[in-house]
Amino acid sequence: MKVIKTLSIINFFIFVTFNIKNESKYSNTFINNAYNMSIRRSMTESNPPTGASGSAGGSAGGSAGGSAGGSAGGSAGGSAGGSAGGSAGGSAGGSAGGSAGGSAGSGDGNGANPGADAERSPSTPATTTTTTTTNDAEASTSTSSENPNHNNAETNQANKETQNNSNVQQDSQTKSNVPPTQDADTKSPTAQPEQAENSAPTAEQTESPELQSAPENKGTGQHGHMHGSRNNHPQNTSDSQKECTDGNKENCGAATSLLNNSSNIASINKFVVLISATLVLSFAIFI
C-alpha cells in the first residue's frame, strides 16, 4: 500500500508539472497570435489610401504656390514702382511711371495697344512692373529725365523690340518641340523574334518533371530546365500561408489561431481529466 501511495503521489506531481508546462506554452502562443492579429488590424485601419493623400497634397501645394506667387509679384511691383517714381521727381516721375506701364503691358502680352499702356496714370505701374525685363527697366530709367512725348516714342520702340524677341523665343520653342524620329519603332519588329526565342525556354520549363530531368538536355538549356523543374514542384502551403501571400492581411494567421485555440481547448481538457483522475486515485488510496 505504501508503494502505491508513493507512486500515486509521484504520478500526480509529474502530471501536474507536465500539463502546466504544456498549458503555459499553448497559452503563450495564443496570446502572441491574438496580439499580432490586433496589431495587423490596427495597422490596416490606421493606414489611409495613398491616392487621397496625393491629391490633397497636390491641390494644397498648387493653391499655396499660386497665392504665394501672386502676393510676391504684387509686393515686388509696388515697391519697384514706388522707388522709381520717388527718385525721378514730380513731372519726371509721371513720365517714368508711364514708360514702366507701357513696358509692363508688352511683357504681359498686351502689346496690341501699347499707347494705352503708356498713357496710364503713374499709380498703375505698381501692379504691372513684375514681368518687365532688364532692357525695359534700363529704357524706362534712362528716359525718366526727358520729355514725356519722347518717352512715349521710345517706349513704343521698346515694346516692338520685346514683341520681336518674344516671337523669336516662340519660334525656337516650336523648333525644340519637334518629336524625335521613330527609329525604335522601326527596329521593334526585329526584336520580336528575339522575344519569341526568349519565350521558348519558358514554354519548355512548363513541361513535366520527367521530361525536364531527362539527360537529353545539353549545353546551357540543362541549367534552365533544372531551375524550371525546381520551381514547378507544388509547394505544401497551408491555407493561412496562401491567404498571407495573396495579400489578405486581415485573414492572415486566422487558420493558425483557430488551430491554436483547438489545441488549447484539448490541452485544458486533458489537464482537467488528469487532475481529476489523480485526485480520485489519491483520495481512494489515502482513505
From Swiss-Prot:
InterPro entries: MSA2 (IPR001136). Residues 121-149 have a biased composition (Low complexity). May play a role in the merozoite attachment to the erythrocyte. Residues 44-213 are annotated as: Polymorphic region. A lipid is attached at N261 (GPI-anchor amidated asparagine). Glycans are attached at N22, N36, N164, N236, N260, N261. Pfam families: MSA_2. Sequence repeats lie at residues 55-58, 59-62, 63-66, 67-70, 71-74, 75-78, 79-82, 83-86, 87-90, 91-94, 95-98, 99-102. Residues 1-20 form the signal peptide. Residues 262-287 form a propeptide. It is found in: Cell membrane. It comes from the Eukaryota. It is a lipid-anchor; GPI-anchor. The keyword Aminoacyl-tRNA synthetase does not apply. Residues 42-248 are annotated as: Disordered. Its main location: membrane. The N-terminal region appears to be involved in lipid binding. Disulfide bonds join C244-C252. GO terms for cellular component: plasma membrane; side of membrane. It comes from Plasmodium falciparum (isolate FCR-3 / Gambia). This is Merozoite surface protein 2. Keywords: Cell membrane, Disulfide bond, Glycoprotein, GPI-anchor, Lipoprotein, Malaria, Membrane, Merozoite, Repeat, Signal. The keyword Disulfide bond applies.
